[in-house]
């Protein structure tokens, strides 16, 4: 835990959004990221709880509490605060196949389960995640990483939506030969053929 008093020293501060009158003029992202030093301060607010409910992702009283992907939230928050961005990206990608769009459209169940939010505002986990993955892209960390050994198994994935592509990615990492089938003329599922393509950049992995 890089800064034990971070949640006491810093109030939650979010990315600044443009006015609605400006937003309706185009489909570009309308939130301006915080300066790097302020984003690191926001990461320092993570309390590194003994039981990190933010990454739990299990049903409590019939409702899912925390990240369903079990993202290692306290770990990469701490790495972000200590200026270890590359390590933070590696930790993020260990559990999340597509943080470039979960950091934009996810409902942030992690923040709803954040212990810091019991008596104040939760840690801005979603925006921290977005900062990390944007750093990874801008610094050239996001490169093809084919497995060193291939198995003799051939697997078909029906549908190229987020779950299908995530499944294909995981199977490919294990060395299997994966073929993705898609009925539409482009891959991405709802991310590219529904309203979300108006709110997400689609010129990266999808």
Model-derived segments and spans:
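Ferredoxin-type iron-sulfur electron-transfer modules and their immediate structural context
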Residues: 1-154
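Conserved small/polar residues in nucleotide/adenosyl-binding loops
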Residues: 196-202
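Residue-level detector of alpha-helix initiation sites
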Residues: 97, 161-162, 186
């Amino acid at each position: 835990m890089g800064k034990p008093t971070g949640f006491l020293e810093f109030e939650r501060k979010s990315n600044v959004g443009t006015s609605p009158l400006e937003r309706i003029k185009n489909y570009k992202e309308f939130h301006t990221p915080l300066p790097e030093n302020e984003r690191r301060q926001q990461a320092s607010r993570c309390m590194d709880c003994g039981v990190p409910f933010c990454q739990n992702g299990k049903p409590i009283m019939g409702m899912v509490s925390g990240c369903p992907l079990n993202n290692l939230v306290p770990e990469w928050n701490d790495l972000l605060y200590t200026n270890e961005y590359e390590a933070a990206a590696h930790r993020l990608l260990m559990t999340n196949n597509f943080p470039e769009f979960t950091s934009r459209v996810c409902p942030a169940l992690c923040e709803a389960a954040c212990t810091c939010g019991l008596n104040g505002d939760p840690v801005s986990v979603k925006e921290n995640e977005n900062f990390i993955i944007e750093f990874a892209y801008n610094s050239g960390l996001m490169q093809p990483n084919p497995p060193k050994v291939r198995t003799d198994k051939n697997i078909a994935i029906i549908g190229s939506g987020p779950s299908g592509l995530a499944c294909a990615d995981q199977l490919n990492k294990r060395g299997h030969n994966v073929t993705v089938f898609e009925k539409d003329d482009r891959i991405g599922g709802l991310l590219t053929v529904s309203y979300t393509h108006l709110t997400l950049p689609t010129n990266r992995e999808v």
